[in-house]
Amino acid sequence: MINLYLHAGSDNHGCEAIVRSTVSILNEKSRLYSLNADKDLKYGLDTICDIKRDTVTVYPKKSLKWFISAAQTKISGKIDLAVKIQRKELLKNIISKEIFLSIGGDNYCYPGTDVLAAVNRNIKKKGAKLVLWGCSVEPKLLKNPEIVADLKEFDLITARESISYNALKTININTVKVADPAFTLPKKLLSLPDNWLERNMVGINASPLILQNGKDSNTVYMAYRMLIQEILDHTDCGVALIPHVVCDGNNDLEVLAQLYDEFKDNDRIMLIGDHNCMELKGYIARCRFFVGARTHATIAAYSSCVPTLVLGYSVKSRGIARDLFGNEENYVLPVQSLQEPDELTKHFRWLVGHEKEI
């Protein structure tokens, strides 16, 4: 039995894509521990794997379990017991020698690595094998001894790009470089909107996260707006605004709907609604160009041979582009370095000018 854990839910269609492609690649009976099982059921993951709820239970302050876990944390300096109590459904039935794949991908790029480490130690104590699957890790994080200690415990690490691979190999010899599993995700072709221009659409993905990671969110938003204006005014292409994450509080549709409203009187622009990851890839694959913020939206484009520009904020976007093209210059625009709204448009012009060679 293959166990997949640290899955946040399929309303992040990148997470959904990782699960679908991983289960297909491994071709083994699989169990998915999900932090949002209802969303996985909505998008049909129960048809390919057994879904278990990874419920995080928070006990009232000064309850018995709270006192026990607080005492252990005070004495040992670790939160292992607290996490074991909170994540009972995940940790109660671990069988020795079973394989547990940590599928968060970029979980180590965000806060909360102490919880990840505690979950991993609890699994390892029961004799299971740990795999960090398709990951990206900012090299500077490896200056943190606690993160290094955690990563050393994995029996296998598959890094999805060379920047992370080169860093992780220095601390865990069981590190290999393997493409993100979502490159193998099949696409599902739905009927296209009536105003879809065959082989002449620019797919655009934007996210609240990319606005937050820029130096100024308004500059990032205006960069998207200026790009759309450029396409409508100076090309004969249509524009398809395509979401890839629809989580509460981090929903691409909120940004995309705002952009759509500014141009909705032009029949060459459309807003694609929410779909599962295979259906979204079906739309992306039929674009002529793609400009995206979400990693797995851009992976859908890359793997469909669609010339792609990434507005990125982390090591994963730079590393994947470097592995595909030899360098990330012109293929990735780091949002942190975006100073003027027209920079995104300038990068898109380069993409159009190099369409055939890409």
Task: Go through each PLM region and give its residues.
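Active-site anion-handling motifs in enzyme catalytic cores
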Residues: M1-I358
